[in-house]
Every structure is written in C-alpha cells, then in structure tokens.
Amino acid sequence: MVKSNLQTILNSHCFVREKESNIPKMPVIELTRNKPESESSHRCSNPCPGPLWCSDVPLPPLKIPGGRGNDQRDHSLSAKLFYSDAQLLVLEEAPQSNSRVRFLLFERRCSVSKHLVWRGALKGTNLYIEIPTGVLPEGSKDSFSLLLEFAEEKLQVDHVFICFHKSRDDRASLLRTFSFMGFEIVRPGHPLVPTRPDAFFMAYRIERDSDGDE
C-alpha cells in the first residue's frame, strides 16, 4: 500500500488533538479511523466561509509533490478511475478500511504546460485541496478552475478548502490568485480550521440556487 504524503486530519466529524510532535511543514488532512460519530458534531454552526467542521487541532506535516517527479507517480499506483472527460482526469486512491474520506487526484488533460496533479480529500460535501510545494507551472490556474467546476457540478460539494505555508516565496501571488477566484482567507481561531499560525487557509463557498428563493 502506497504511503501518501497527504496524511489525514479528518475524523468522522471533528478533528482530534494531535500529540506533541515536530511539525515542520504544511498542514494536511488526516483521518482518525474508528472514531465514533459524536452527538455534538451535529450541533456545529457554520459561520462561513468554510465547511461544517469543529477543530482547534494542529495539523501534521505536508509535502505535496504536485505531479513533479516520481512522487506524483507513486500516488496513482493504487488509484482507480473516478471520472474522465475531454478536459479532466480524476483518479481515486484506494480507500482505507472504514474510511469516510475519499482521496482524489485531479489532472488536466491535453495540457502543454508542466505536468500538475492536484490532490485532495473529499469528506461529505466538503473538498480539501493542498497547494503543491514549489513554483506552480504555467496553466495551473486553468487546471484548478476545472477542478472547481468539477467539485461544484459533479461532486456537489458545498465548500472547497485550500491551504498553503505562509513562508512560501509566492505567497502574495497565491493570495491574489485565489482571492480573484473567489476564495476568502479563513481567520485564525476560526472553528472550522485547525490552529496553525504557519499556514494560510482559504475557503470557497459554492452558492446554490434555492427553488424557494424569489
């Protein structure tokens, strides 16, 4: 079984507190298996933006290769076809036993730019995406737009989360780019994200038309 760089921080509904350890890099999504669903999880409020979640936990380390080098190929060794069309290929990694989280790999088809794979975790109606380390290749914005469109139309998610390290050289550029795409910074202390002062979290809320609205 391939060890994923995207470890999990999601349990059935709420994050669990991580034991003290060295956390040198980016946050990731981690699943605690066999965690019973708590009654309090159903009472969580949703002070948007962001998904319905409870947490104040730090996140474990992250290193997302983003499709550069052999690490990317390792991700797809156990992955199966999830969706395919003329523009986008989506693979699903082999699920863990009793896992409620689905790990997906998104790749734009027919791209003339450097190969890029976005990796994310789907939990319920929320999709969590980590920004690959290093400089994003040309065309990455277009491929992420395809990901967002797929998340809205095919996955029917309510929110998309992204996270990246504050120490990135391209931090300002990432903030501008994702803000332009409709993402909002999730403020420190927000109940929907873990406490990580070294990381930026941004959230995209997918608005849906209501038949009852005038």
Curated annotation (Swiss-Prot):
Signal peptide stretch: none
InterPro entries, A to Z: Acyl_CoA_acyltransferase, ODC_AZ, ODC_AZ_sf
CC per GO annotation: cytoplasm; nucleus
Alphabetized UniProt keyword annotations: Polyamine biosynthesis
GO molecular function: ornithine decarboxylase inhibitor activity
GO biological process, one term: viral translational frameshifting
Function recorded in the entry: Ornithine decarboxylase (ODC) antizyme protein that negatively regulates ODC activity and intracellular polyamine biosynthesis and uptake in response to increased intracellular polyamine levels. Binds to ODC monomers, inhibiting the assembly of the functional ODC homodimer, and targets the monomers for ubiquitin-independent proteolytic destruction by the 26S proteasome.
Assembly and interaction partners: Interacts with ODC1 and thereby sterically blocks ODC homodimerization.
Family from the record: Belongs to the ODC antizyme family.
Protein name in the entry: Ornithine decarboxylase antizyme 1
Organism: Danio rerio
Taxonomic lineage: Eukaryota, Metazoa, Chordata, Craniata, Vertebrata
Gene name as annotated: oaz1a
